[in-house]
Amino acid sequence: VVEVLHENTFTETKNISDAFNKMLGRMKVLDDSREEFVSNVSHELKTPLASMKVLADSLVTQDQVPIELYQEFMGDIAKEIDRENDIINDLLTLVKMDKTAQNLNISQVNVNDLLELILKRLRPIAEKKQIEIILESFRPVTAEIDEVKMTLAISNLVENAIKYNHDEGWVHVSLNADHKYFYVKVSDSGIGIPKEDQDHIFERFYRVDKSHSREIGGTGLGLAITRNAVIMHRGSIKVYSEPEEGTTFTVRIPLIYVST
């Protein structure tokens, strides 16, 4: 009896020890993730400020700056201010989503109309690069979604499809549904995503082409925001891409929202 009790006590102690070690491991992962995020935020916020300082210092130290150079530098400073503002806005969006993960504003939404409005807003941006945007709706779709968050998710995908595309390219958006889900596909004729990067593109601040990220624009937060919004709807998002052959994102969302 004593041996059995001793064995049971040993087993229970080992189980408690294993559970405690697992908990410590999870806490370390969370802590490391938090430290990395803070480090990334600091770096991203400092970069536009550093650029603005260099430009401003150049203007201050020169006598009789030519008006053309002055205008060019001020234009560059304005772009860096816009970039800083975009980063802050995207960070606030992510923080807000983390805090309100359980507070979706669910309503019956006509998804066809939603996509029409998104593309109407983004067409002028596409026209600057002579990119054609095509919408193909296979059927009328009404779903229980948070209209604001879903608009944000789809808008980010279409904006990326325009941003990382070639001039005179195309963006194709399609909507379909079955008895349980609706599906939005966003395809483009753009630069594509290398296979080794595809597992990381939804991470915060991850950029596929870091050498061109500043000239193309973007904060590295758009796809993280999209993924958050999709997951909050109990949905899924997948990517298929080949370098220089374009990219397709497929979003699947339940027609009826089920809270847990």
Locate predicted features.
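Membrane-proximal HAMP signal-relay module
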Residues: 1-38, 53-65, 74-75, 82, ...
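Conserved catalytic submotifs in the C-terminal HATPase_c
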Residues: 105-108, 127-128, 132-142
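Short alpha-helical segment within the cytosolic histidine kinase core of two-component systems
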Residues: 116-128
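Short helix-loop "hinge" at the ATP-lid/N-box region of the Bergerat-fold HATPase_c
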Residues: 161-162
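Acidic ATP/Mg2+-coordinating residue in the GHKL
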Residues: 188
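Short conserved segment of the HATPase_c
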Residues: 193-207
